[in-house]
Curated annotation (Swiss-Prot):
Superkingdom field: Eukaryota
Domain remarks: Key residues/motif important for the effector activities are degenerated in most NLPs, including the nlp24 peptide consisting of the conserved region I (11-aa immunogenic part) and conserved region II (the heptapeptide GHRHDWE motif) that is important for phytotoxic activity.
Keywords: Glycoprotein, Secreted, Signal, Virulence
Record protein name field: NLP effector protein Pc121494
Positions annotated with a glycan in the UniProt record: 143
Entry coiled-coil feature ranges: none
Lineage of the species this protein comes from: Eukaryota, Sar, Stramenopiles, Oomycota, Peronosporales
Organism, as annotated: Phytophthora capsici
């Protein structure tokens, strides 16, 4: 009975993927940045982190305005394979909320493929998400103070409160995407290297079709989701991630 339940869950998960319109990863058009109207949106722009690529893929847009999603890139060959950047541009997603009296802004990057030991698939998998969290005392751009930072590390979270100045470029956290030789997976880490900025779109600025596609897509193609690839901003996952990232 337990095996049957697992099999049904796997089939349901596959159906959820098939229900979304998937297009080639390098044809997904990033959603243009919007004019910031709320304090939370303005704060997300002010603390927009920059991403330096040390190893692996460059970030791409995961979804476009009509809800069509990236079909990712099958793991094969070199770490950066055919994913050295889209001519259409790239995207970073932001969502924010209160956590234990601190204002948390999560920024998430999508990668067409990632590396991790995933038996029996091999050393990599289609689709990957990495994220950074900026912790503020209040959700404003004018008079807020950066209290701490967190990153999705090779294992668990890397948390710092306060952030070291060598990792900051003004109000922007410097983040590096790299391959961790110890745990044999791709992840993000703090860096002193300057990176690039991707087109920022906040969760509440996303078109409904795009947001629903991000929520309803199962981004983990591995058998029984052993790679644990999840869109970190979807309801039910977002607060779980922020609770784990809390650095105080």
């Amino acid at each position: 009975m337990k095996f049957i339940a697992v099999l049904i869950a796997a089939i349901a998960s596959l159906s959820a993927v098939q229900a979304q319109k998937a297009i080639p990863y390098d044809t997904v058009v990033p959603i243009p940045s919007q004019t910031s109207k709320t304090d939370a949106q303005k704060a997300a722009v002010k603390y927009h982190p920059q991403l330096h690529i040390e190893d692996g893929c460059h970030p791409y847009a995961a979804v476009q305005a009509d809800g069509a999603i990236s079909d990712g890139l099958k793991w094969s060959g070199p770490q950066d394979g055919a994913c050295k950047g889209s001519p259409l541009g790239s995207q970073v997603y932001a969502r924010s909320t209160w956590v234990k009296g601190k204002w948390a802004i999560m920024y998430a990057w999508y990668f067409p493929m990632g590396q991790a030991p995933v038996p029996p698939v091999g050393l990599g998998h289609r689709n990957g998400w990495e994220y950074a969290v900026i912790w503020l005392d209040r959700p404003t751009a004018d008079n807020s103070t950066l209290l701490g930072v967190s990153l999705s590390a090779a294992v668990g979270w890397s948390k710092e409160a306060p952030a070291k100045q060598k990792w900051m470029d003004g109000n922007s956290l410097k983040v590096s995407y790299y391959y961790n030789n110890i745990f044999r997976n791709t992840a993000v880490k703090y860096t002193e290297e300057k990176g690039e900025f991707q087109t920022l779109i906040t969760w509440d600025q996303l078109p409904d079709a795009a947001r629903n596609a991000l929520i309803n897509t199962d981004w983990d193609e591995t058998p029984f989701n052993v790679a644990r690839v999840k869109m970190p901003m979807k309801d039910g996952v977002f607060m779980e991630k922020l609770t784990g990232a809390y650095p105080f």
